[in-house]
């Protein structure tokens, strides 16, 4: 089963221009869904993505990428 990433294009802490290329680097075959995912509270202060329908958030994109990799290894 292919991995799926969901990212928000409305949340203040999410920078799609830098986040999407990093997610594609981790898994080029994953699907990436862009849109509101009703995660607005945490999305104001932390960058986040949903990895296979599970939320993953961090204060920096670098920390987020580490958490995404961990989530994918433990799936």
Swiss-Prot record:
Belongs to the UPF0741 family. This is UPF0741 protein Bsph_0950. InterPro entries: DUF1450 (IPR009910), UPF0741 (IPR020880). Signal peptide: none annotated. It comes from Lysinibacillus sphaericus (strain C3-41). Pfam families: DUF1450 (PF07293).
């Amino acid at each position: 089963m292919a991995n799926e990433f969901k990212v928000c294009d409305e949340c203040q802490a999410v920078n799609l221009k830098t986040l999407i290329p990093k997610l594609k680097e981790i898994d080029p075959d994953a699907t990436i869904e862009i849109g509101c995912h009703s995660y607005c509270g945490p999305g104001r202060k932390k960058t986040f993505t949903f990895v296979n329908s599970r939320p993953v958030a961090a204060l920096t994109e670098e920390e987020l990428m580490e958490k995404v990799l961990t989530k994918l290894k433990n799936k």
